[in-house]
Amino acid sequence: MESMDKGTDSYGVTTGFGATSHRRTKQGGALHKELIRFLNAGIFGTNGESGHTLAPSATRAAMLVRINTLLQGYSGIRFEILEAITSLLNHSITPCLPLRGTITASGDLVPLSYIAGMLTGRPNSKGDWPDGKEIDAGEAFRLAGIPSGFFELQPKEGLALVNGTAVGSGLASMVLFEANVLSVLSEVISAIFCEVMQGKPEFTDHLTHKLKHHPGQIEAAAIMEHILDGSSYMKVAKKLHELDPLQKPKQDPYAALRTSPQWLGPQIEVIRNATLSIEREINSVNDNPLIDVSRNKALHGRNFQGTPIGVSMDNTRLAIAAIGKLMFAQFSELVNDFYNNGLPSNLSGGRNPSLDYGFKGAEIAMAAYCSELQFLANPVTNHVQSAEQHNQDVNSLGLISSRKTAEAVEILKLMSSTFLVGLCQAIDLRHLEENLKSTVKNTVSQVAKRVLTIGVNGELHPSRFCEKDLIKVVDGEHLFAYIDDPCSCTYPLMQKLRQVLVEHALINGEKEKDSSTSIFQKIGAFEEELKTHLPKEVESARIELERGNSAIPNRIKECRSYPLYKFVREELKTSLLTGEKVRSPGEEFDKVFSAICQGKVIDPLLECLREWNGAPIPIC
């Protein structure tokens, strides 16, 4: 004000704006009133239909960030105005801001002008009240208890309110919080994926990743290594890998599991770097001109350029798309019985696979999510248009990029929800597999003892030596390849059990000529006895499992990943999906999605890592 009285010429105080800054006026208050009026150029559309209003949470973040900037004292604005914005926040009154219409170059001019519009009592100003009611500026001030009434803006105060990056950076900060959570979640569920796929934990070995040097990769591997260390699933998997090792691949499949630390590592680094950049931005002074009181000087610069936002958000979106791509690859292997090490096709949990297609619809949905996510990975910042009479010829598009990244985060939440339910389904199927396989082994063993041990005259029969090899067949055969009809001669179990008896009969030599010592003669009796007892025993074991009376407890309880499983199953009340139940997969996905959106997944996620000290397991 003193500078104006002395005749000092200052941008936005005595001049017009942007390309019309050659105009001059001494009516500073009227100038800023006009600034707010012409910047109110956004479109909201019809209530509830077109969705052109910025989310209230993003608006509130913008208000908070703008207060933080203005409090630093370089913007030329009264403290009372900041107190008024604070009162609106504290009373949960949120001005309505247009979703679109800013290029985040001379700041987020258009959306921020609607906050200024409420402070100055513009008749078109609207706000949201917590009960959903839309209120005008007068009602907002009354409910917020702001006694001073609407503000008559003094010179520079209009610019101080609108000429900043708060909307883009506020939304970016919210997006990055969720992106960081989802990146950690992707690391943990990659480890769970290894558990249910009976993978080899060697891919997390510290030395492998130390030799690559990249910190994100080292962290991802260390988290997975921590989750898998001591895992009950890994102990079982080790025994399985030791069976006929020369008949199996030496290493796990290339991408979805074995390369997950190398894939996730760079994405983690990108998200961390973006977080640091946005942290700097929300704590910066980002308007123009800046008032240096100590030197009694107005500094004309361009801190309102939101390039850190646009670039950080573009990079984050690319990282999110990469995480989603890995998640889709893992999910595709999980539901495919050619790759999932014995789990049923589509993770079908019912008795009849012809009437249970499990997660087939979910895989189609995941493909759609992933495709949209890959499209969103395209950059925004290379679509700059020269604006405002070519005055803003390069601009950041920060809020646009933030909005698109928010969309990408939502899609990754959809994918994470679907995958998490799929992993819990796989965990329960492994539990079912272990219990039913134990039942099959016991039944085969008992039938072998009854039928193969004793001959017709009570003597020991040569077929008694078959039992051990029969049990080996059960151990080596994937349960879900036959369990819907365990005694079917078209399924591998009965075929291979018969093959064992035939091979022993061939070894039996001359004894096969005597019916009392012939193993061939025992095959029919063995199969008939098995057909009499095995289906009943399997069904009985399944019923007991469904009642919660499993003979073998669920291994997940002995794993560090258990808190996440427990959260999905117990707190969110989801359960094994089958074609025999009315409940659809989407109903379960919705529960998990809502929990992720509400931040409820954070505590169980951190509980999985509670014992982790932030470092890889030492090399011994």
UniProtKB/Swiss-Prot annotation:
An annotated Gene Ontology molecular function: phenylalanine ammonia-lyase activity
Gene designation per UniProt: PAL
Main location: cytoplasm
Compartments reported by the entry: Cytoplasm
GO biological process: cinnamic acid biosynthetic process; L-phenylalanine catabolic process
PTM field: Contains an active site 4-methylidene-imidazol-5-one (MIO), which is formed autocatalytically by cyclization and dehydration of residues Ala-Ser-Gly.
Substrates-to-products reaction catalysed: L-phenylalanine = (E)-cinnamate + NH4(+)
Binding site residues for (E)-cinnamate: N163, Q251, R258, N288, K360, E388, N391
Family: Belongs to the PAL/histidase family.
Lineage: Eukaryota, Viridiplantae, Streptophyta, Embryophyta, Tracheophyta
Pfam family, one: Lyase_aromatic
Subunit structure of this chain's protein: Homotetramer.
Any one cellular-component term (Gene Ontology): cytoplasm
Top EC class of this enzyme: lyase
Active-site feature positions: Y11 (proton donor/acceptor)
Numbered residues of crosslink 5-imidazolinone (Ala-Gly): A105-G107
Known role: This is a key enzyme of plant metabolism catalyzing the first reaction in the biosynthesis from L-phenylalanine of a wide variety of natural products based on the phenylpropane skeleton.
SUPFAM superfamilies: L-aspartase-like
Positions carrying 2,3-didehydroalanine (Ser): S106
Enzyme Commission code(s) on record: 4.3.1.24
Gene3D superfamilies: Fumarase/aspartase (Central domain), Fumarase/aspartase (N-terminal domain), Phenylalanine ammonia-lyase 1, domain 3
Keyword terms, alphabetized: Cytoplasm, Lyase, Phenylalanine catabolism, Phenylpropanoid metabolism
Species of origin: Persea americana
Pathway listed: Phenylpropanoid metabolism; trans-cinnamate biosynthesis; trans-cinnamate from L-phenylalanine: step 1/1
Name of the protein: Phenylalanine ammonia-lyase
